[in-house]
Amino acid sequence: MNAERDLAPLAPSVVRALNDKLYEKRKVAALEIEKLVREFVAQNNTSQVKHVILILSQEFALSQHPHSRKGGLIGLAACSIALGKDSGLYLKELIEPVLTCFNDADSRLRYYACEALYNIVKVARGSVLPHFNVLFDGLSKLAADPDPNVKSGSELLDRLLKDIVTESNQFDLVGFIPLLRERIYSNNQYARQFIISWILVLESVPDINLLDYLPEILDGLFQILGDNSKEIRKMCEVALGEFLKEIKKNPSSVKFAEMANILVIHCQAADDLIQLTAMCWMREFIQLAGRVMLPYSSGILTAVLPCLSYDDRKKNIKEVANVCNQSLMKLVIPEDDEMDEAKQSITLSAEPNPEEPVSKPEAASTGSLDVSGDSSVSNASVCTVTSSERIQVTLNLDGIVQVLDCHLHDTSIGMMTRIAVLKWLYHLYIKTPRKMFRHTDSLFPILLRTLSDESDEVILKDLEVLAEIASSPAGQTEGYGPSEAAEPRPGQVELHVPIRNSQLSSSGPKGLECSPSTPTMNSYFYKFMINLLKRFSSERKLLETRGAFIIRQLCLLLNTENIFHSMADILLREEDLKFASTMVHTLNTILLTSSELFQLRNQLKDLRTPESRNLFCCLYRSWCHNPVTTVSLCFLTQNYKHAYDLIQKFGDLEVTVDFLTEVDKLVQLIECPIFTYLRLQLLDVKNNPYLIKALYGLLMLLPQSSAFQLLSHRLQCVPNPELMQSADGSRASASSRRPASSTIDYTELLQHFDKVQSKHLEVRHQRAGRAEQPERRVVL
């Protein structure tokens, strides 16, 4: 009985009914409690109201006995109904015990708790919003409840709460975000569905700006996007689409920088939907935020570049990644080359930044993920920022180069990715050459190795980068000279090309020391030529399969004369004589047959200028590594007497199958259009006796082969000199009309030829283990 007095003002019959196992009796007791509380409200007796709620909470709802807990729940709901609009004054006391019952092991009790809370919330309406977080927390747990009745009850309560939030303007979003951020990482499907449904509701409320807090929940949203449930994935897609729609409508208020790294992470996701969605977001971010995204370029490239090599199964991702890559590349501007110096300026913070936003892209009217569309790209941020903020948006070139270098070293990456990496390097050397040359020494080796790539497209793009490095004015500085080219060089007096005054003033002494043969290129040009030849020497297969292709492309990208001049210069000092001979043969074939070298051939054919004569001498000294190519060079330059003198010396050489094969090829070449002028000169027998002698010399060297027959037939067509007397007898040949040719010391050139061939003979003997070779001479 003492217990009954302790529970006053509740009557003993009410107490007994609340503890009864039958629902009907508990319901009758609840009606009595409702009546009692109404009387207290009418009397304005708040203390008694609080006392009743306390009793129902402590003695019933939180009781150890399940039936008592059920009675307490229905009693608290009855109190709320009786209080009506005044229930807001007691919500904390009413809600807390009910929420505690959400964790009860008995599913029936959890259901009654849902029912009770529904009645409490229905009465209180907007007054429950200050308690929204605890209600949301409780509901998020019930959303994953295994009992279907409990889940159904929680959904009913959930809809009611959403209606209240939608119609109210008092929702505390700031207080709710931490809880949402925590709950969004739940792995339970039902909890995720619950979270997404609430995000969609909050997005739809005009007075709630959830976009401001998107950085807090974006990562969680992308994780939910990978859920196994198609329904949840679809809901998440819709939510992300709505956010993207809002971002496009009002980009100036979006915190792009805070979300950039989140997108970078999910652009690398294994799940296709997550990756595609993140990539679409990245595309929009780059195009809307512009240069605000530059500090995150290295991360973006890490995510985007591998996607460029995807096959058709991931075509959508590949296309969007390509747009991202192109858009990001356009953000790099020449001013980035000066940014470091600008930041170091003391007065810069007080000065306006010269970079002004170009234009604001028109906001898209839909938030759907457009895979193939490429909206207009802006080279500047659409966000309205102060000058000091713009100064901080700088290009992290070190990070970008590190990523590009890493991808070039990775042999597993696809062809399109390698091409994109090389395009980036080329673009950076064009836009920010001064900064890029700080990285050239580290990039140079991998760029050279890339010349061995299987793809012609990769090699072409690689050559463009190397050519830009070799020709950029930024490379001709005191700080960036290659060490290899600074070595003393034998024969420098003879091989040195005259330097124009303008080039002297621009290049400086450092540049001349590094590359005396190539004054129009920078200090890296000569280094490039040295290392390219080293590459060919160590990789003979590369020389055989791609050597001509590489050199011909370089002739399109760089000065042809400089390429041949420098390579001949380097080969002059080559210790591997067999390689030198092979390389000279390759260069000679290119010189005589490639359309890219038409102008250089014309220049050498006439030898009218000091530069052309100097080039001839330089080429000749290296061409001596290969006797037949030396003769062909003399034919090209119309030095027929010297060609004859050389052929006379062939009798002292070791005649091998390779040697005869080269003579055979030279005969075939003489029949080609390139030597049309030479064949026409055979008509002028009187003025070209040494041409005819030289050709007869080749004929005598050849065995009775098809080439022998070809040359023999050609020589049979040479007219009788006496028959040609009716022609202008005073006419001199082209070679005899060149007064400048007398400035070339042909005797010294012949001596040089003898020295080089003696070295070759010595090396061959050493290889064969022969001490001596008997002299053999062909008398012509």
From Swiss-Prot:
Disulfide bonds: none annotated. It is found in: Endosome membrane; Microsome membrane. HEAT repeats lie at residues 5-42, 89-126, 171-208, 212-249, 438-475, 558-596. Keywords: Endoplasmic reticulum, Endosome, Membrane, Microsome, Repeat. Pfam families: Vac14_Fab1_bd, Vac14_Fig4_bd. Its main location: membrane. One of its GO terms (biological process) is phosphatidylinositol biosynthetic process. Residues 348-377 are annotated as: Disordered. GO terms for cellular component: endoplasmic reticulum; endosome membrane; PAS complex. Gene3D superfamilies: Leucine-rich Repeat Variant. It comes from the Eukaryota. Residues 365-377 have a biased composition (Low complexity). PANTHER family: PROTEIN VAC14 HOMOLOG, TAX1 BINDING PROTEIN-RELATED. Belongs to the VAC14 family. Scaffold protein component of the PI(3,5)P2 regulatory complex which regulates both the synthesis and turnover of phosphatidylinositol 3,5-bisphosphate (PtdIns(3,5)P2). Pentamerizes into a star-shaped structure and nucleates the assembly of the complex. The pentamer binds a single copy each of PIKFYVE and FIG4 and coordinates both PIKfyve kinase activity and FIG4 phosphatase activity, being required to maintain normal levels of phosphatidylinositol 3-phosphate (PtdIns(3)P) and phosphatidylinositol 5-phosphate (PtdIns(5)P). The C-terminal domain (residues 523-782) mediates pentameric interactions and is necessary for the formation and maintenance of the PI(3,5)P2 regulatory complex. Forms pentamers. Component of the PI(3,5)P2 regulatory complex/PAS complex, at least composed of PIKFYVE, FIG4 and VAC14. VAC14 nucleates the assembly of the complex and serves as a scaffold by pentamerizing into a star-shaped structure, which can bind a single copy each of PIKFYVE and FIG4 and coordinates their activities. Interacts with NOS1. This is Protein VAC14 homolog. The lineage of its organism: Eukaryota, Metazoa, Chordata, Craniata, Vertebrata.
